[in-house]
From Swiss-Prot:
It comes from Caenorhabditis briggsae. Belongs to the helicase family. RecQ subfamily. Keywords: ATP-binding, DNA-binding, Helicase, Hydrolase, Isomerase, Metal-binding, Nucleotide-binding, Nucleus, Zinc. This is Putative ATP-dependent DNA helicase Q1. The keyword Kinase does not apply. It is an enzyme of class 5 (isomerase). Residues 586-618 are annotated as: Disordered. Residues 95-270 form the Helicase ATP-binding domain. GO terms for biological process: DNA replication; double-strand break repair via homologous recombination. It catalyses: Couples ATP hydrolysis with the unwinding of duplex DNA by translocating in the 3'-5' direction; ATP + H2O = ADP + phosphate + H(+). Coiled coil: none annotated. PROSITE patterns: HELICASE_ATP_BIND_1, HELICASE_CTER. A motif (DEVH box) lies at residues 214-217. Residues 295-443 form the Helicase C-terminal domain.
Length: 618
């Protein structure tokens, strides 16, 4: 090859290198521009949300008045029948809307008084209100409470005695009795043509006045608790024309609300939404100890020191966890009882009644212990394990402090719980996405807990409004601050561990679980990074899609493995991977970051990751 040709090729190569360098610079500029635009977009969304809230206030003012034809009677029924002095927020407005034949959706936090929004109109309208509720046990409890108030309410299910079923069916079709509320499950409506025919007759004689759908978020496939039998409810608006529909839930995002309206055929339903904030609740996220014995010891110490003699709930992931923890609490002198769906109904009821009466102090439960729990003086709710969604966490923690007095909500969090939970919910349509949102909440040690909840429920919120009623805001005044570090070098170590494990096993058995990955990474970075840092790094890479879970199904279980994620496959090795860390000495962290960028390494073992004491994680 001639020198002229070689020189020409070298020149072309240099030119291409220059073009590639320019493109890299343009990509970096575009990324920065994208970040700026995202910030502007989020700011506009917050303004729009605040404007929407203003519009909601206008709607509330229109309906929350005492000038309706039935207002005086409604107040009399409230005092004389329900023995209440005044309406809670949104109750009066919702009642006025459905009495005006308007479709409506009420979003009220757990314990906010949703039931009255259809129970009182049932007496006002002097006809039948059909209540669709998912749990038979909850239905039976409500009917018992209504009957104590002298209100005729009934249900139709597999356990209903024949004589009672006959009475109810005659009342539905003839409309000449005092039956005011009929409770059914969505399954009952979906599977019983006879039931639907009877309701049509009820409408024909002018007896059916209102349809109330409890836990209405279950209609939405994008909700945290979608139930297929709720899909049948899309026939109600067509089949029972002129009958208003009232949906009730404790939590619903805008997407879920839109989906519910579309599915039920009530696109212009009036939405009454209470603010998400419960000012009397103190939210805390604590690092879950590595061993179960240590975790039990910590919970026992917390209950004895801070909540001695006070009522509480502890939520666990599985029935086995419930039984073991309840046994451990009792062994430590705490009056506790387990509660889960696999218990006999009579045993569940007995545990519930003992807790309500104060005979036992703490109920240790799965999510089976939830809807319809009406005990105002719960002083603490502890989550022994990570909930499957923010909605679940908000509802479960919201069972504390219904009397308005101070209460504490404690969540114990550790990475290993992510994989336990994901293996249980991975087949739900939005299960993993909902779980990862919960992980973002739990793993964030910088952002006010109420800000995180507000973001999820699409409400405007300023950290200063929290009044130090969460662990983040409580420590912020004394906090040494945070530092954003580039963890791209450490990410390479993580990816190499995964790939080396796979390549070393010819039979494909080299897949690695999250817990095993943490052990190997901690050994690789021993003396340079703490185990807590390694845990936070894996979670960060998982949430940012540099890693992802891959599920393997066996006869007895579902196993979660961690594999290389989509984002890593398109990752430019020159780019940073920023991660925010609690930091005792921010300047030193930034200096270590600069050193890390400058380091030229040829193997994982040579990565300079700084000193252990630079970072306080989790």
């Amino acid at each position: 090859m001639s020198n002229v040709l070689l020189s020409k090729l070298s020149s072309e190569l240099a030119d291409l290198d220059g073009q590639v360098s320019q493109i890299d610079q343009q990509i970096s500029q575009l990324r920065r521009k994208k970040a700026e635009l995202i910030q502007k977009k989020q700011a506009l969304e917050r303004k729009i949300e605040m404007k929407t809230n203003e519009d909601s206030d206008v709607v509330l003012d229109r309906w929350d008045q005492d000038s309706f034809p039935w207002s005086d009677e409604a107040n009399q029924i409230l005092k004389n029948k329900f023995r209440l002095e005044k309406f809670r927020p949104l109750q009066s407005a919702a009642i006025n809307a459905v009495m005006s034949k308007e479709d409506a959706i009420v979003i009220l936090s757990t314990g906010g008084g949703k039931s009255l929004c259809y129970q009182l109109p049932a007496l006002l309208a002097k006809g039948l209100t059909l209540v669709i509720s998912p749990l038979v046990s909850l239905v039976e409890d409500q009917i018992m409470q209504l009957q104590k108030l002298g209100i005729d309410a009934a249900s139709l299910n597999a356990n209903t005695p024949k004589d009672e079923a006959k009475r109810v069916e005659q009342a539905i079709t003839k409309g000449s009795t005092e039956l005011r509320l009929l409770y059914v499950t969505p399954e009952k409506l979906a599977k019983s043509k006879r039931m639907m025919n009877q309701l049509e007759k009820s409408l024909g004689v002018g007896y059916l006045k209102l349809i109330a759908i409890d836990e209405v978020h279950c209609c939405s496939q994008w909700g945290h608790d979608f139930r297929t039998d709720y899909s049948f409810l899309n026939v109600l608006k067509r089949q029972f024309k002129g009958v208003p529909i009232l949906g009730l839930t404790a939590t619903a995002t805008s997407n879920v609300l839109d989906d519910v309206k579309k599915m039920l055929g009530i696109p212009v339903a009036i939405v009454f939404r209470a603010g998400f904030n419960r000012a009397n609740l103190n939210y805390k996220v604590l690092t879950k100890p590595g061993s179960e014995d240590e975790c039990v010891e910590k919970i026992v110490r917390t209950i004895k020191r801070k909540f001695s003699g006070k009522t509480g709930i502890i939520y666990c992931l599985s029935r086995n966890d419930c039984e073991k923890l309840a046994k451990s609490l009792k062994a430590n002198g705490i009056r506790a009882k387990h509660y889960h769906a696999y218990m006999e109904p009579v045993d569940r009821s007995a545990a519930h009644q003992k807790w309500v009466s104060g005979e036992i102090q703490v109920i240790v439960a799965t999510v089976a212990f939830g809807m319809g729990i009406d005990k105002p003086d719960v002083r603490f709710v502890i989550h022994h394990s990570l909930p499957k969604s923010i909605e679940n966490y908000y509802q479960e923690s919201g069972r504390a402090g219904r009397d308005g007095l101070p209460a504490t909500c404690i969540l114990y969090y550790r990475m290993s719980d992510i994989f336990k939970q994901s293996s249980m919910i991975q087949q739900e349509q939005t299960g993993i996405a909902n779980l990862y949102n919960m992980v973002r909440y739990a793993s964030d040690t910088v952002t006010c807990r109420r800000v995180k909840l507000a973001e999820h429920f699409e409400e405007a919120w300023e950290p200063s409004w929290c009044q130090k009623q969460c662990d983040v805001c409580e420590k912020s005044s004394n906090s040494p601050g945070t530092a954003t570090e580039d963890v791209s070098k450490e990410a390479v170590v993580v990816i190499n561990i995964i790939e080396e494990n796979l390549s070393s096993a010819k039979d494909g058995s080299g897949r690695i679980t999250g817990n095993k990955l943490l052990d190997l990474l901690s050994k690789k970075l021993k003396g340079r990074r703490t185990k807590d840092f390694c845990e936070k790094l894996i979670v960060h890479l998982l949430l940012e899609s540099y890693l992802q879970e891959d599920f393997h199904y066996t006869v007895y279980s579902v196993i979660s493995y961690v594999v290389v994620g989509l984002k890593w496959r398109v990752y430019n090795r020159k780019d940073e991977i920023p991660m925010t860390l609690d930091n005792t000495k921010k300047g030193r962290a930034e200096e270590n970051n600069r050193k890390r960028k400058a380091a030229v390494t040829s193997s994982d073992e040579e990565v300079d990751v700084g000193d252990d004491d630079d970072v306080i994680t989790l």
